[in-house]
Amino acid sequence: VLALIFAFSVPAQEAHAEEAYLNEDTTMKVTVTNMSPEYSISDVRPITTMFDCEIIMAFKMDEGLCMTFTTSCIGAAKVIGVKDIKVQQKMWYGWKTVLTSDGAESYDSAIFAADLKYADAIKDRTYRVICTHYADLDGYEEVVNDTGAFKFTY
């Protein structure tokens, strides 16, 4: 009797799938934050005043590779910013630097943001972005951020 009740009380499951078509207005955003594989949850972590150090990448058909760099700290830093920016394209022999920037900085601020575009990005090619976030709030700190590889499609 119990098996008969169970057989009738299970609702039917259905799944529907549909192919999404991308158009020129479609934008894919990729956010990468600085995370250290050196520390696990149970480990003691070093004291830091920086957080939300991000590289946001958007691939746009009419603009190329658009990037936003953000750096935040827990109080107003004497100086805060991003430096040593490299946009690299994957080649058969390794990574080729296709764009560099010295970066930018702000003073007496807790948040920094800057934009950068690489208009010559080629569809179906793989790119990565590397930079150094830094801040000086009771001592200078910096962290290197690497997006890893992302394929430019739209």
Predicted regions and their residues:
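Beta-strand elements of well-folded, non-transmembrane domains
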Residues: 73-75, 89-91, 120, 133-137, ...
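Short beta-strand elements
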Residues: 139-154
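Solvent-exposed serine/threonine-rich low-complexity stretches and specific carbohydrate-binding patches
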Residues: 84-85, 96-109
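Hydrophobic residues positioned within well-ordered beta-strands of beta-sheet architectures
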Residues: 53, 67, 83-85, 114, ...
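Extracellular and analogous surface-interaction loops
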Residues: 57-61, 118-123, 151-154
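Short, solvent-exposed, Trp/other aromatic-anchored flexible loops in extracytoplasmic proteins
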Residues: 104-139
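Short, surface-exposed binding/anchoring microloops in extracellular/periplasmic proteins
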Residues: 47-87
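N-terminal prepro-regions of secreted/extracellular proteins
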Residues: 1-60
